[in-house]
Amino acid sequence: MIEFTCNVCGSRNANPAFATEPASCACGSNVRTRALIHLLSMELFGRNLILADFPRLKSVRALGMSDKECYASILQEKFDYRNTYYDREPRFDFSQPHGDLAGTLDFVLSADVLEHVAPPVETALMEVHRLLKPHGFLVATVPCSSGEMLREHYPDLHEYRILPLGGTPVLVNRRRDGHLEVTDELAFHGGSGATLEMRQFTVAALYEKLLASGFTNVRFFNENVPECGILFDHDVSQPVIAAKQQPFALAGDARAEIIDQWRSAEDRAWRDRQLAANAGNLAREASAVNESLAARIRLAARSRWLRLGQAFGIGPKLT
């Protein structure tokens, strides 16, 4: 039995085993999503925090690429963050330029998306790089196979559609040279249409593509964190983090937000201590009053006149 605390929601779990995709926590998280949040926490704060316990930093701006609702909703509470999708609204196509966002993002999250974007994948990676601030970073999970070479399934993809043919989806593509090609035996991840698998990465190829797109300090994560339910003893997408230029450091506004929240928490703790102290004083005062009353009752019980009245069934009954 594997016991762990989910680093997304903070709940305790006990599972007999993990698999690649099925959720292993009631919140919906799996090994892949918990690894993603672990990397994010370590890069932002230098320690492994539960996402639900992250400080609220609305000065930190971020974008999600098809993030799961179980952590996207919490990220939205914590940061100036919005989640987007490549296959449905709110749609965000990283293969197209977004000049209004250039240099504005502190981080981008991508969970098993890079294998789906249209070729060449460098176009999307370079756009992510362009949108990040100088200290910004990308955190991603990417399915990787063994070997060295990247395998592009459709290197000549240009104008294409996925159409049914005899009940089976096929890819119809018009290449740049005008040649028409039809491909069957398509691979889809979690759906159809835009979720078509475009390529198979290897760790070496992913590293090369990230560097070629301008990223620095590319780090792959394979360390088990059993207390958070992160185990790499089965097929898990490869977690990776890549910086734009500089190591990440919280900006002054974010540090000020943390200090304000700490002071607010400290004030609440001080008020709680005062309330507890006042409650203790009231309890002690009540105890003293009760003891004084009990002493007076004991004294009254020894009164000859009171005992006489009790013998005749008159007067107060004291115990």
Predicted ranges, named:
Residues 249-319:
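Boundary detector for helix-to-coil junctions that initiate low-complexity/charged tails
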Residues 95-109:
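A short acidic, Gly/Pro-enriched loop at the edge of an enzyme's catalytic core
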Residues 4, 119-264:
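S-adenosyl-L-methionine-dependent methyltransferase catalytic module, highlighting the catalytic core
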